[in-house]
Amino acid sequence: MLATPASARIVQARGQWAAIEEQGHCRAMARSLRDSARDQPQAYVALLFDLARRSVGTVSVRLGRPLRAGGSVILTVGEQPFLLKGQGWFAWSRGPAQEAAIVAAMRGAGGMRVDSRDGAGRRNVDRYLLDGAATAIDAAAATCAQQ
């Protein structure tokens, strides 16, 4: 399960995923199956819903290691790859069309992975199970819509 700030409220949790509401925005989140090194924050993936910012399903990834300058981040859902934009420790979806395609792929796949290379050129792969993802996404979207 994910560690959440004290101000966050877990709306729903199932499988590897949880829907979280905090200060006017909602997220569907899961942590990487690979535990991070002791001195590193845990990698995670989140879909953000925030109507005030017109964000409906923005995909955000906290990488396991910082991205190499100018490097690429590939999110592969099932067998379908998506090129994300990234910088430092984070990567993001490229817009509403890609976000809709990612969510659709997540609903039909069993797992996904995020591939990148760090500053030393080492490959970084974070894997996620999608058990509970659709339910968490729907719960986060519904909670956000009620605000």
Predicted regions and their residues:
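Bacterial N-terminal signal peptides
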Residues: 1-3
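A generic "folded-domain core" signal
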Residues: 6-147
